């Protein structure tokens, strides 16, 4: 909507109960203000939301694309690039991971039907968003491994997926159907994206709490 901006409460509570102070950053059309955001905050969390505008990763819209907002996309991509040029930590969730990938010149499958091979249903139908849907396998060399171990069961609420990871991004977790479930920046101190929603599993999963605590600790340092 043009007249409101919001963040779902689980993101806010997950930051708060991990020792951080949540600050909501509204969409603005000012590069000067973006630089002030960078100075103001110690770490950045990019949340879930709408699909990414296909033109921003070099494609025209295909069947299955959902709602998009190019103004928000461009704002978040500019902010992401600023953060990655600094040493400040960034944790990106679902759409946030897709923004992370797009900002680094990666590409997307506009709908998971376009991914080669047989895919899982990544839009789970359970009543509770904390319910798990499928396992992910985590790379031992990744930062995620120190928080989550070799594998973890996650929830799943997405229909888009990363096709080609962006420049300097490495894949750190995969689903059983080889969908990319997490990425990390190879040279940034703390830049992680996950496709699932750890904020919805925060109360039920110690591993997800460790993930948020790792982000907040990086911001505090």
Residue ranges and their predicted role:
Residues 1-91, 102, 107-109, 113-147, ...:
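N-terminal beta1-alpha1 cap of cysteine-dependent amidohydrolase-like domains
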Residues 94:
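Conserved G/P- and acidic residue-centered "switch" motifs that form tight phosphate/ATP-binding loops
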Residues 97-100:
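Hydrophobic, aromatic-enriched interface-forming segments
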Residues 192-195:
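Active-site-proximal beta-strand elements of phosphoester/diester hydrolases
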């Amino acid at each position: 909507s043009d007249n409101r901006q919001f963040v779902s409460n689980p993101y806010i509570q997950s930051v708060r109960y991990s020792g951080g102070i949540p600050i909501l950053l509204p969409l603005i059309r000012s590069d000067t203000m973006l630089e002030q955001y960078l100075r103001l905050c110690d770490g950045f969390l990019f949340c879930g939301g709408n699909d990414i505008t296909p033109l921003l990763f070099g494609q025209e819209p295909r069947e299955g694309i959902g709602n998009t907002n190019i103004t928000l996309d461009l704002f978040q991509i500019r902010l992401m690039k600023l953060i990655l040029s600094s040493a400040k930590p960034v944790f990106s969730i679902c759409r946030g991971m897709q923004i992370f990938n797009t900002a680094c010149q990666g590409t997307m499958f506009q709908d998971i039907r376009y991914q080669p091979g047989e895919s899982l249903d990544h839009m789970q139908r359970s009543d509770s968003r904390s319910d798990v849907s499928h396992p992910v396998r985590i790379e031992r060399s990744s930062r995620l491994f120190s928080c989550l171990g070799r594998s973890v069961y996650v929830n799943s609420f997405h229909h888009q997926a990363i096709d080609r990871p962006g420049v300097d991004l490495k894949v750190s977790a995969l689903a059983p159907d080889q969908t990319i479930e997490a990425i990390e920046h190879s040279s940034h101190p703390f830049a992680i994206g996950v496709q699932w929603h750890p904020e919805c599993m925060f109360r039920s999963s110690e591993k997800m709490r460790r993930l948020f605590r790792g982000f907040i600790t990086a911001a505090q340092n």
